Curated annotation (Swiss-Prot):
It comes from the Eukaryota. Its main location: nucleus. Disulfide bonds: none annotated. One of its GO terms (molecular function) is transcription coregulator activity. This is Mediator of RNA polymerase II transcription subunit 14. The lineage of its organism: Eukaryota, Metazoa, Ecdysozoa, Nematoda, Chromadorea. It comes from Caenorhabditis elegans. GO terms for cellular component: core mediator complex; mediator complex. Component of the Mediator complex, a coactivator involved in the regulated transcription of nearly all RNA polymerase II-dependent genes. Mediator functions as a bridge to convey information from gene-specific regulatory proteins to the basal RNA polymerase II transcription machinery. Mediator is recruited to promoters by direct interactions with regulatory proteins and serves as a scaffold for the assembly of a functional preinitiation complex with RNA polymerase II and the general transcription factors.
């Protein structure tokens, strides 16, 4: 120990020396930094204090060595200069690091803080002093200034003192160094002490003096040498030699032989419990299953070598008790190992000794494990059900009692409970059989009880008890079965279940459902008897009491019989409760009844239920139950009536309750007739079914009673009785007399009526069925594709019709008798009125109408007749009763019209779905025919009218299809903007049954339906007729049957002349006084208002729409479009005349002033225009035009004549091309701007331009389908920025230029196209392409150069060059920056849909089926998808809005839609043709009959605003 301490003491003088040296350094530093002279205090004599009033705080202090460095150097030099001779200049103290010294703050920051504080105080003072204006405020202002000045002076005096203190502050730095040095030394001492303690506790813990080696010391002292090395050194550094694997194998083999030899000698003493002995690798493993396993070996070959115990493994396990760990702790196992090894060393038979020792230990351990498991069960899951009666570890006995009965005895203390176990199980070790292990004994004994499996190693008391419970439960159930059979011999008791056995008892003889079976089982945990009936409640009193009675030891046969009777009654009551759940009754408690009603129940049995009828709350059904020997349970039903303060029982008939055909009643309404000889099947129905039917019967009788009383109030005779045996069902309310409610004689109807009754159906819901049975029905179905209703075996020509059942269900959930009576009367009135008209019609039908129509259906409340050539038109007749009083004027017939598939297609395999859409035109006049039928009740006349007029009306109805005609160009020409520039092209409506009017603009045609298959058509346009050549139109179709009626019928005056429109314009308003002679009037184009008589075939041909050259039209449509176009063309030409007054922003400024109107008639317009020749616009050369209605083709044509000698290119072929282009492109287009462009093109005559234009038109019209280049002249231009239309061909008169737009594409249907826009210089005869594309400009230069060389006109040369390059793929310009056509639909209005089906615009109540949409050719009036653009490729981009509105005015769709009165499109139409100052033509008739916007002519000096500007869209 002294040698370890010496170094510590050796270092002490050095530390003392260092300490003395440190003290001398401190003294020298203090002497070095002493001041040379004392410093006088501050003049103020006050000490420096830094507080919050000066604006400085400790949080704002920062280190500032930079700003104090200069002052520190000056002070140090001054101090050292005075004492340099005595002390050295170098400071012996260490330097203080930056973060270890005191905190500092820069002086400039401190000054900034002070200045900012003063500035803030001045600002606050200035704001406060402005508010003090009175004398008192003046005094306060002075005081504030004094206080501010004093505080500011004091603050800056402190700063001055601080600055003076900085000169001597350097002397304080030595204190900081001393403090830092002391802290550093203190930390050294602390670290040294910590290190010494760590060395003492760690490294020096084992440092001790070694033992003295005597032998080496003697050798050293005597011999002087050291010859022996200690074995510790050898063992530490020289490892022992390892044996080889072969040697190891030999050793283990030898050990195995020795062990086998030793064990063979001890084999007679080895216990038989050791089931397995394994010898391997020199080890012997002995295994006792379920107890232990040991490993032993021999460490020598001699006989005296003892057995060595290597390992013990206890196989007794319980993971729940040990929580996953072995039951024996390793320390305990080591102790066992040592004790057993010592016992084996002294034992004569070590193997037997080891077995006896470990077997005894394992048996004790197994018993302890079972005790712990039982304790857990007794405290947990099987609490109060098992008990540990005895546990003795020494005797090794464990007694467990189960199925404990708890009872109280008078001998016990209050609160104590006596626990008696019904059964016991004893687990013990037999002293006479030590090798047998634990054994089990049961009290009382029974076969197949639970056993312990000791060989498994994991004993379980739970498994033992579970196996025991199963046997005990079966024992108890068998005993209960014997008791039940002895008490009730007729009771059928069955044992069911294997793992969970139970007894099943059928309480009632007819019990078949498991829910009604009683199940008796035993609770395996406590041994109690459990009874359960699924259909009854689990807490049912009788069920629980019966289970307790069976569990008790005192259960007599009488007690069992009593409980079984109670349970049977309870089961029947529950059956009845469930059977009436779906019926309109509810169970009420006796406490809910009134006191006087309870008195009536005094004598009734206690087992009863009371049912209250929901619809008749004054009636109660009392059902009582009582046990009976024969019927098991006897049921008695009584009806209790509670009215006011009186209650009484009503006697029920026995046949209502017991004599009902329940099976037949279930099949009610299915038309199944039971055999008459078959007896009632009541026996096959259960008791509750009969009760349910009885409840329903009573409910029906109560309902019929109320209903019969209400019918008798109305004067209707009734009889409540049952039907005959072949009619299924119960009661029925038969109606016997209705004479008092029928307003007319109806004897024929009642002769046909066999039975009229009302039945109640309450199977699914509470509904009534009004049932009537008829015979000799007037009309039956006789369509060709169907079969009439006739009996088998009867002749087909029998005149009397078959009897039929008419059973109709009234889907009403109301139980009001008044409502039912009203519905019954309404149904009777409907049948009577329908029969009245149908019976009259049936007489004529058999003689005449069966050749022209067929009966689709007659059901007494509805008649459906198909008529027409194909029997595809339907007339649907019904009668509606609106009023309460029968025969009121409010009642009316429903007369609707519809369609069906033609009869010839019903049996055909192929159906043409692409045929023309059809609709029933009679739907236009359905309201008129309905009113007429209401007045006359004559269905014969109605059907005669329908059959006679269907053919012409189908043809005329083609004009009722909704088609819109664009008015955008026209509205721009006349000035005012129209929000919706479209109008209906045609409007067809009916004035009466025989008069129709077709309106197109201000042209109105009246069509009269005459007898003898004749039609009369006349012009009834307002103020004067306007249809020139109307007679010629029909005469061209059929001259033999067309004639003019001699008697001219006056045109009816307007119903409201003030709103009919302004006076019609006259042609003189648009013509100047000219000296030209007028042409002679063609007599074929005469105008007349006399009716034109024709046949049905003629009008059908005139209205037959066909596809002609890509346009769907008919002769009458072509004629009316021509008349309308002439009127619009006249207004267009007037805008091109010098008299036109144009707007500043009008797009027609470049197209006016060169047209003069010569003459205008309803059938032609003559005008002239100045030519554009090489000298510019020359007024002396004219082009003469005549647009006229051809009397042969009855379509518009044009005649163009140039003055003689003014146009050499006006050859016959070129003029024919120009006129053909007008007929095929300009007129079908129907656009006013297109007409302006056409006139501009035809009046261009400079340098044979007519030839070039004719070539262009020929290329457009004669484009072959196989050509890769399609060229089209653009006639209309749409400005995408202003949304305005304009002529695409314009003339700039001052510059003498004309603008051309040519569309080039691959085909007419191609969506991609290019626009060639160029300017033709009229005087210079060359073209200019205003494009940034250099190729286009180069191409124009080439054409101009060629024209100069060869002469001619460059227009056609340029277009031809473009075509050639387009075919070769060299030209594909991208000049589509301003497309020719774009959207023109107003953005603030949504355009309506295309075409609605006829049902959308037909009269109310129409049943015409929905027709498909418009089949018009899609496209705008000037777009490429229009009818004419598809043929001639005029334009490419469609106009905005739906395609249905992008229509050519002359294009006609397939018939099938209706533009009838009441259509919402009537507000969007532009009525009439166009006159000056208005969009709608003067004198035009608005479509429809009522509800159209009024129009008053403007007074002089007032501007006109079209009424459409003020119409709300969409209309409300």
């Amino acid at each position: 120990m002294s040698s370890n301490v010496l170094p510590m003491y050796a270092s002490t003088p050095s530390r003392a020396f260092a300490h003395s040296k440190l003290s001398s350094q401190l003294r020298a530093a203090l002497a070095d930094n002493s001041p040379a002279a004392p410093i006088s205090p501050a003049p103020s004599g006050s000490a420096l204090s830094l507080d919050e009033s000066s604006g400085i705080s400790d949080r704002d202090v920062h280190s500032s060595q930079e700003q104090t460095a200069h002052l520190s150097e000056v002070d140090v030099k001054s101090i050292h200069s005075s004492d340099s001779e005595d002390e050295p200049a170098q400071n012996p103290l260490p330097e203080v690091p930056a973060n270890c010294g005191p905190p500092t703050i820069p002086l400039n920051v401190l000054l900034d803080f002070a200045i900012q504080h003063v500035y803030h105080e001045i600002t606050v003072l200035a704001e406060l002093m402005q508010r003090k204006t009175n004398d008192q405020g003046e005094q306060e202002r002075k005081m504030s200034l004094v206080h501010f000045a004093h505080a500011t002076r004091s603050q800056f005096l402190k700063l001055v003192a601080l600055v003076k203190w900085i000169r001597i502050s350097k002397r304080m730095d030595v204190c900081y160094s001393i403090d830092y040095l002391l802290d550093l030394q203190s930390q050294y001492f602390i670290d040294t002490a910590d290190r010494l303690v760590a060395m003492t506790r760690g490294d020096l813990e084992l440092a001790r003096l070694p033992e003295y080696h005597i032998a080496p010391a003697i050798d050293v002292l005597v011999l002087g040498t050291y010859n022996r090395m200690p074995s510790k050194i050898k063992e530490a550094f020289i490892p022992p030699a390892k044996i080889t694997p072969r040697e190891q194998k030999l050793v283990t083999s030898r050990l195995n032989q020795l062990i086998e030899s030793r064990l063979s000698r001890l084999s007679s003493g080895i216990p038989p419990n050791i089931k397995e002995i394994h010898i391997n690798n020199g080890l012997a493993t002995l295994l006792v299953p379920g107890e232990f396993e040991i490993k032993i070996t021999l460490l020598g070959e001699t006989e005296m070598t003892k057995w060595t115990l290597l390992n013990i493994k206890i196989l007794v396990e319980d993971y729940e008790l040990g929580m996953g760990l072995p039951l024996v702790h390793p320390l305990q196992l080591n102790q066992l190992h040592g004790v057993l090894q010592s016992r084996m060393n002294v034992s004569l038979n070590p193997i037997k000794e080891a077995f006896s020792f470990l077997h005894s230990f394992c048996v004790s351990l197994q018993l302890d494990v079972l005790f712990c498991q039982t304790s857990r069960l007794a405290a947990g899951r099987l609490r109060d059900n098992i008990t540990i009666e005895k546990y003795d570890p020494k005797e090794r006995v464990l007694v467990v009692g189960y199925w404990v009965k708890r009872s109280k005895s008078r001998r016990l203390t209050v609160g104590q409970v006596k626990c008696d176990a019904q059964y016991r199980v004893q687990i013990y070790e037999d002293p006479n059989d030590k090798l047998g292990g634990l054994k089990v004994r049961h009290f009382p004994h029974a076969p197949q009880l639970g056993r312990l499996d000791s060989g498994a190693g994991m004993l379980s008391i739970d498994r033992l008890l579970s196996e025991t419970y199963v046997v005990r439960c079966k024992e108890r159930l068998m005993r209960l079965r014997r008791i039940l059979e002895a008490a009730e011999p007729r009771l059928e008791v069955k044992m069911t279940g294997i793992s969970a056995p139970s007894l099943s008892l059928a309480l009632l003889p007819d019990t078949s459902s498991k829910d009604e079976m009683m199940t008796v089982s035993v609770n395996s945990f406590c041994g109690k008897v459990l009874c359960n009936v699924h259909i009854l409640s689990a807490e049912h009193e009788d069920v629980l009491a019966f289970g307790k009675a069976l569990y008790s030891s005192q259960c007599s046969a009488h007690t069992i019989q009593m409980y079984l009777r109670k349970l049977r009654v309870a089961l029947v009551i529950e059956r009845y409760r469930r059977s009436v759940k779906a019926l309109p009754v509810r169970e009420v408690q006796e406490a809910e009844l009134l006191p006087f009603a309870k008195e009536c129940l005094g004598d009734a049995p206690a087992q009863r239920i009371i049912l209250q009828f929901l619809r008749s709350e004054d009636y109660y059904l009392l059902v009582t139950f009582s046990p009976d020997e024969k019927a098991v349970v006897k049921t008695h039903i009584q009806l209790l009536e509670v009215v006011g303060d009186r209650a009484q029982f009503i006697q029920l008939e026995d046949d209502e309750m017991n004599g009902m055909h329940v099976k037949e009643a279930i099949n009610q309404g299915t038309m199944r007739f039971s055999p008459s000889h078959k007896t009632s099947l009541q026996e096959e129905c259960s008791r509750e079914q009969r009760l349910a039917f009885a409840v329903a019967t009573v409910e029906d009788r109560i309902t019929y009673m109320y209903l019969a009383a209400e019918l008798m109030k109305k004067g209707i005779g009734v009889d409540v009785r049952k039907d005959s045996a072949h009619v299924p069902g119960g009661l029925a309310l038969h109606i016997t007399d209705v004479k008092n409610v029928v307003p007319f004689e109806a004897s024929e109807f009642f002769e046909c009526c066999i039975r009229c009754c009302l039945r109640l159906d309450n199977r699914n819901r509470y509904t009534f069925q009004f049932e009537m049975c008829f015979e000799n029905i007037p009309l039956v179905r006789d369509v060709p594709h169907g079969l009439p209703h006739r009996r088998d075996g009867e002749p087909k020509d029998r005149t009397s019709k078959d009897a039929t059942w008419l059973q109709e269900l009234n889907h009403i959930n109301q139980s009001s008798p008044e409502k039912l009576v009203e519905l019954i009367i309404h149904r009777l009135m409907r049948y009577l009125y329908m029969y009245k008209v149908v019976h009259q019609f049936s007489l004529a039908y058999e003689k005449h109408f069966k050749n022209y129509c067929n009966i689709e259906a007659y059901t007494f409340h509805k008649l459906v007749v198909s008529y027409g050539d194909n029997r595809d038109m339907l007339m649907i007749l019904a009668f509606n009763v609106k009023s309460q009083a029968p025969g009121s004027s409010e009642d009316f017939f429903f007369l609707n019209f519809g369609q069906s598939m033609p009869h010839r297609q019903f049996n055909s395999t192929e159906i043409d779905w692409h045929q023309k859409p059809r609709w029933n035109p009679h739907s236009m006049m359905s309201q008129l025919m309905r009113d007429d039928l209401k007045e006359t009740n004559d269905l014969v006349f109605t059907m005669h009218f329908l059959c006679e007029t269907i053919r012409p009306l189908v043809a005329i109805g083609n004009f009722s299809r909704i088609r819109f005609q664009s008015q955008k160009s026209l509205s721009q020409l006349i000035g005012p903007d129209v929000h919706f520039p479209f109008r209906l092209k045609y409007h067809l409506y009916a004035l009466d049954q025989t008069t129709l009017r077709l309106m197109q603009g201000n042209v109105i045609l009246e069509i009269k339906l005459l007898e003898g298959c004749k039609i009369a058509v006349r012009d009834v346009s307002r103020y004067r007729p306007r249809c020139a050549g109307l007679f010629q139109l029909f005469s061209n179709i059929d001259s033999e049957t067309t004639a003019i009626m001699n008697d001219e019928i006056a045109i009816p005056q307007s119903d409201n002349p003030q709103t009919a429109g302004p006076t019609m314009w006259t042609p003189e308003q648009f013509m100047d006084s000219l000296d030209e002679r007028p042409e002679e009037i063609d007599p074929r184009m005469a105008i007349t208002s006399q009716p034109i008589l024709m046949s049905h075939d003629t009008i059908i041909k005139a209205c037959d729409f066909k596809d002609t050259e890509g346009r769907i039209t008919c002769p009458l449509d072509e004629y009316l479009c021509s008349i309308s176009y002439l009127q619009r063309a006249l207004l267009t030409l007037e805008r091109m005349s010098p008299r036109a007054t144009l707007n500043k922003n009008s797009s027609s400024n470049l197209s006016c002033g060169f047209v003069t109107i010569i003459d205008a008639k309803p059938d032609f317009i003559r005008f002239r225009a100045s030519q554009m020749n090489g000298d510019g616009v020359n007024a002396t050369s004219m082009v003469h035009y005549k647009i006229y209605l051809c009397p042969v083709a009855m379509t518009l044509k044009i005649r163009i004549e140039f003055e003689e000698g003014t146009n050499s290119a006006a050859t016959a072929d070129n003029l024919k091309t120009l006129t053909t282009y007008f007929e095929k492109v300009v007129f079908p287009c129907g656009d006013e701007y297109a007409l302006q462009s056409y006139i501009c093109l035809t009046r261009l005559t400079s340098f044979e331009a007519t030839q070039s234009i004719a070539n262009l038109m020929n290329v457009q019209m004669e484009h072959p389908p196989t050509s890769k280049c399609c060229v089209q002249l653009s006639l209309t231009y749409n400005n995408t920025s202003t949304k305005k239309l304009a002529p695409a061909t314009k003339v700039d008169q001052p510059l003498q230029n004309i603008i051309f737009n040519v569309i080039v594409s691959q085909s007419r249907t191609s969506e991609s196209f290019s626009v060639l826009r160029f300017i033709y210089r009229i005087k210079e005869n060359f073209v200019v392409v205003p494009s940034a594309n250099e190729k286009n400009k180069q191409m124009a230069d080439e054409v101009n150069a060629e024209t100069k060389t060869s002469g001619g006109n460059p227009i056609w040369n340029l277009v031809r060059l473009v075509m050639d390059r387009f075919n070769s793929g060299d030209w594909n310009p991208g000049n589509r920056d301003e497309p020719i056509i774009s959207s023109v639909a107003p953005p603030t209005y949504v355009n309506p849909g295309s075409v609605a089906g006829p049902s959308s615009v037909a009269a109310p109540g129409s049943v015409s089926i929905q027709q498909p949409g418009s089949v018009l050719q899609p496209g705008s009036m000037m777009g490429p998808q229009s009818v004419n653009a598809l043929q001639y490729g005029m334009h490419r981009q469609p106009m905005g809005g739906p395609q249905s509105m992008q229509m050519n005015p002359s294009s006609v769709g397939q018939p099938g839609s209706v533009g009838g009165p009441g259509s919402h499109q009537q507000h969007m139409m532009n009525p009439g043709s166009v006159g000056p100052g208005s969009v709608g033509g003067p004198g035009s008739v608005n479509p429809g009959s009522v509800g159209y916007p009024q129009w008053n002519p403007p007074s002089v000096g007032q501007s006109y605003h079209h009424p459409l500007h003020h119409q709300q869209y969409p209309p409300q």
